[in-house]
Amino acid sequence: MGPVWLWLWLLVAEVLLPVHCQPFSAHGDKSLGASQPASHQSLEPAPAYHKVTPTITNFALRLYKQLAEEVAGNILFSPVSLSSSLALLSLGAHADTQTQILESLGFNLTETPAADVHRGFQSLLHTLDLPSPKLELKLGHSLFLDRQLKPQQRFLDSAKELYGALAFSANFTEAAATGQQINDLVRKQTYGQVVGCLPEFSHDTLMVLLNYIFFKAKWKHPFDRYQTRKQESFSLDQRTPLRIPMMRQKEMHRFLYDQEASCTVLQIEYSGTALLLLVLPDPGKMQQVEAALQPETLRRWGQRFLPSLLDLHLPRFSISATYNLEEILPLIGLGNLFDMEADLSGIMGQLNKTVSRVSHKAIVDMNEKGTEAAAASGLLSQPPALNMTSAPQAHYNRPFLLLLWEVTTQSLLFLGKVVNPAAG
């Protein structure tokens, strides 16, 4: 009998809604990389998620660069979603396969043993899942196992304890009905934002590992829809203009201009513990900015942001992206996961079970009532005073990068590039 397959399917969704909020507080209270105020709690051990979040960021930047070489258009994915699913899968891997998965994510297993990695993800997922009145962030893992299988109880127990993964019995010989059941679960868990997400699978599928992350936030400073201009120009490249709706506001935001990377970086806050970085390359400098995307660059930006009144122009758009990553992940070290040498016997107690597909889907929606990303143009100076008539203009009218962070854990929830805001 030929090999039977396990699938890893991930999806993410974002929806951002309006809020009439309190006056803007001091900009020092929420920032990427900001240190916590000194208190008696500073003597307590650091949360376990600190052992994984820097590695997730590094993994995300490496994966982004590979995607940028392969994809000409919009890019969007969730580093937390993808890395946590691969780490969960490693629970059922043995020997070299487990080592390969975790090391490909960027973990030094001598410094951070596998047990500490899993406890770090447990801490991260638990913290992100804590209820918040101003930010809704819902993550989940589900395992769909063929009903003929006898999965290892140790794997199921660890997956539930560390990753909150719930296991379901499935009949993959009835592919259409089972696919509908899984899609119904996803639609319910993402409040109808993701519909019909699951790709077709064959009758010899044994397992589907599904991850979802649903992000719902409110702008700290919502846009006035009456200020939106319906037909402003967005440059797909230096020769091709596109007419799109452009939102506008004058508000306080943090920003900087990075001469080394040739880009403008704008930080926009949400209510709650999330913020968005919008990175606008100078004309013709996108590849230079992408090459400069390193953890050190992000730390430098976090230290240099200054608050200023800005005349901000952001596109209104909705984009999605879907990837089959089985050709991309081997380029960052995950090769054996997709061949018969992979040892995933910790899941089902059998060898010769391999992963056939890693699918990842992300959705982002941005409008006046709540925004998540924007298109690019730059701020080249910082004003000496809050003068409404002389506020510098941040006009996002060409391709740009977006990085969406949860501040408490310093975790990168979404990373992407908006090339065409009208691509859908």
Swiss-Prot record:
Keyword Ribonucleoprotein on entry: no
PANTHER family per record: SERINE PROTEASE INHIBITOR, SERPIN, SERPIN A11
Subcellular location field: Secreted
GO molecular function annotations of the record: serine-type endopeptidase inhibitor activity
Protein keywords: Glycoprotein, Protease inhibitor, Secreted, Serine protease inhibitor, Signal
Protein family: Belongs to the serpin family.
Record-level GO cellular component terms: extracellular space
Gene: Serpina11
Protein name from the UniProt record: Serpin A11
InterPro entries hit by this protein: Serpin_dom (IPR023796), Serpin_fam (IPR000215), Serpin_sf (IPR036186), Serpin_sf_1 (IPR042178), Serpin_sf_2 (IPR042185)
Keyword flag Metal-binding: no
Signal peptide from the UniProt entry: 1-21
Predominant cellular place of this UniProt entry's protein: secreted
Positions of glycan attachment: N108, N171, N352, N387
